[in-house]
């Protein structure tokens, strides 16, 4: 079956970008702004402090769910202020606890291997976060993130119908491809989702980030979960 890549945001579009403080999301926001889009940055607030920061001789490493969230938000706010980008923090702690942490514990106790990132993307990042944006009365054309994946649409209708739903497809950089973590996102959500880094390699992302002198280019790559 033949598939067509969906168009990326264009000059004049209003785009909400999910910012984590990392190089991928930061560069995504900057590239869209330079393209002429009105960019609005949003960050999820997940950390509730329930896990001790010091566990004997071990310390929680920086990750999406950790005390480093405070620093991440500060860096996102600084980046947005420097680049004249509207910025919001959306509290999704309850949804993260219910859909990710409780799921993780239940799977682990049942002897199964959990995948918290799939749950988070399906129910939090592309679920609760978008609901939070709606509650802020933010209107937008697209929601973008720095994921390495792309949105495609089948040329022919599925199952002999005229239905041509948006789907997740592999990014150019196979070593960073994240389609596995995104595959549960419903097609109706994907209609307004775009991944501007789909055609770039991680090497190109870092090169551009250094060229634009982004502080995020000097950070270590983010780690999933805790």
Q: What do these predicted ranges mean?
A:
Residues 198, 203-226:
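Anionic-ligand-binding alpha/beta catalytic cores of soluble enzymes and soluble regulatory domains
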């Amino acid at each position: 079956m033949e598939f067509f890549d969906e168009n990326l945001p264009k000059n004049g579009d209003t785009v909400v970008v999910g910012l984590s403080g990392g190089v991928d999301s930061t560069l995504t926001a900057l590239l869209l702004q330079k393209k002429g889009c009105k960019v609005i940055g949003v960050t999820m607030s997940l950390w509730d402090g329930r896990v001790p920061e010091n566990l004997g001789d071990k310390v929680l490493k920086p990750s999406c769910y950790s005390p480093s969230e405070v620093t991440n938000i500060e860096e996102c706010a600084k980046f947005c202020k420097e680049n004249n980008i509207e910025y919001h923090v959306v509290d999704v702690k309850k949804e993260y606890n219910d859909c990710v942490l409780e799921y993780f514990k239940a799977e682990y106790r049942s002897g199964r291997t959990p995948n918290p990132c799939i749950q988070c993307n399906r129910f939090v990042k592309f679920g609760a976060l978008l609901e939070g944006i709606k509650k802020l009365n933010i209107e937008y054309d697209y929601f973008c993130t720095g994921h390495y994946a792309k949105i495609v649409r089948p040329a022919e209708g599925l199952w002999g119908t005229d239905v041509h739903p948006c789907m997740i497809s592999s990014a150019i950089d196979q070593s960073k491809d994240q389609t596995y973590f995104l595959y549960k996102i419903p097609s109706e959500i994907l209609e307004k989702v775009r991944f501007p880094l789909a055609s770039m390699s991680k090497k190109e992302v870092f090169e551009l980030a250094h060229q634009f002198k982004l502080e995020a280019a000097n950070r270590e790559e983010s780690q999933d979960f805790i």
